Amino acid sequence: LVDLFTKDSFNTVEDYSNLDWPETTWNFACSTTETSTWADGGRKFGELMEKATGGKVKVNIYAADQLTNGNQSEGIQALMNGDPVQISMHSNLIYSAFDPRFNVVSLPFVYDSYDDADAKFDGEAGEKLKEILGEYGLHCMGIAENGFREITNSKHEIKSVDDMKNLKVRVAGSNLLMECYKRWGADATNMNWSETY
């Protein structure tokens, strides 16, 4: 079923209904909003899963980590526990709270382009991250990037590190990013993604 959600089979799916699936419902959680591509991906996964199992497996979508009151770290812990979350899409930044090795994905200035990042995570780096998730009893179906860490604000354009001085910014729950922004002179605050919109 890992191939169920790949680019090649995005709109078609093989029939696995002969595998005697128990009737069950899985909960899919993501930290982004209901209208995000992450939630859309969860809905598409649910559609394909239901089709592949002859309707025996249904998938409920819980955006903004609704099952854990918006707490992203608790969302991952719920996935590790298998209850109430069975499938999730979360950022490496949140996983870094459990294991600092996930910070490698967010190191500044490591990737030359989106193609470079994709090549790394489609290769050895991605396989290593999947191994680390396996250490926590999790199975990674795929790795996706969500863009580089662009800095957006309502005060002024940022062209150099000097423009960061005393700028109040929201930073995802990563000690690495908090330290980077502080060293760049920003007034960084940790905030869950679900609290930003």
Where are these regions (language model features)?
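Contiguous mixed-secondary-structure segments that line small-molecule binding/active-site clefts
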Residues: V2-Y16, E47, S73, G82, ...
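Extracytoplasmic "Venus flytrap"
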Residues: F10, T25-R43, A64-N69
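Extreme N-terminus of proteins, especially the signal/transit-peptide cleavage junction
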Residues: Y16-E23
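Residues at or immediately flanking beta-strands
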Residues: T25, K56-N60, K168
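Extracytoplasmic small-molecule ligand-binding "clamshell" domains
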Residues: K44, A52, K58-M80
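Short, well-ordered coil loops that connect the C-terminus of an alpha-helix to the N-terminus
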Residues: G55-K56, E135
